[in-house]
Amino acid sequence: MAGFRNHLKREERKEKRKDILMKRIRPDRCRGASDSRLPSPIPARVYRTLDEEVKRRYHPIPPRYEHLPAFCLFLYAVAAVCLILLIIQSGSVAFSDWFNLHISAPLRAFLAALTAPLPFSLGEFTVLLLPLVLVVTLRHAIRRRCDSWRTAGVFIGVLISVLLSFFSVFVLNFSAGYRNSTLDVKLELEQKQVSAEDLADTARILVRHLNEEAGKLGFERDGFSVMPYSLAEMNDRLSDAYAAFCSSHDFIRNNAGQPKPVLVSEILSYMHITGVYSFFTGEANINVNFPDYTTPYTAAHEMAHQRGIAREDEANMVAFLVCIGSNDSYIRYSAYLNMYEYVANALYSADANRYRTIHAELNSATRGELSAYNRFYEKYRDSAASKVSDAVNNTYLHTQQVSHGTRSYGMVVDLTVAWYKAYPEK
């Protein structure tokens, strides 16, 4: 008798669970013979227990919706391995150096080669389409997938696995660049406390080079210099310059990646973003709304990221060295002028009188270009978007062990001073 009573209790519990599930299904989602709407979904285990007449009003949820797909489990496993790799990278500079050169470099080259034939930035389109994809995905999930707590949990698990795939790509492609040996060590530079005199000496060298290069360029009536070729031609010249630089330095590997213009450059201008490296597509993206003289140097900066130079001051420095090694006058001019802005700002803060003296030695065309840039930049200077963008970028850099955050961009001044102390003739 006891066994029979237990059997009845089990059957009662099954019936109660079935009743609960049936009550959760909205009556307006059921269909009759003349209703063109799809039948309401119901868990397969409940569907199998229904009478044939009742089954006509429902359809079983596909079993794949009630279990994480094998591919998602694979993504979770890869993310776990990448987390271990990230921990090792954070604790070992030597491992990060090796990983960046021998694991990340081939993967970066593969992604760059994969997306290079596209005439647009896949990374940009991914970001722009993301809101639409999220809306469509959530709508599909609510209407067709999440019919029970189990299927909702599976759906969330799938979304998390997709997010983790971005984390895995970041670790495999780029994170070691934030944790490897610093550029001053690689270039064998001796970095010391920078004095106002050091800044003045470096600024004078840059002014001398700017005066030499400016005489070879054309300037518009609005004060800006004119890049004498297309973006595609600029990319070819920068690729040649990078090939030469990478062949003479063993800490960087070249690849076929070239910068791509961003369609929403005006929006990026309000965010104070001149370029961005898309690590998940291997693309270097540049803001083409800014004046010409910023474009080659910005492109070279993003190409440095594309080749594994992750820290911002180091990407600035590599871009500078690559550009001044170019055979093209405008690319050299772009590098000298962008670096002069960094050094001159630091000199002005340290010794305003010295800054004014040295700035007066700059040729009138370049001084006019800097004045024109100030007028151009005025409408973007204090935008709300820039404050949000700066906060996000600053947080991201801190998470990558860049203690100075967005201020690290300006730390290229220390590297430049050390470079010209070691190589004053260059």
Regions found by a protein language model. Give the residues of each.
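Cytosolic-side transmembrane helix boundary signature
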Residues: 129-160
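Transmembrane alpha-helices and immediately adjacent membrane-cytoplasm interface residues
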Residues: 136, 153-182
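Membrane-interface segments at or immediately adjacent to transmembrane helices
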Residues: 175-243
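Auxiliary, metal-adjacent structural segments of Zn-dependent hydrolase domains
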Residues: 218-288, 292
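Post-HEXXH active-site segment of zinc metalloproteases
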Residues: 311-337
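Pan-zinc metallopeptidase signature
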Residues: 367-426
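Membrane-embedded alpha-helical segments of integral membrane proteins
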Residues: 80-141
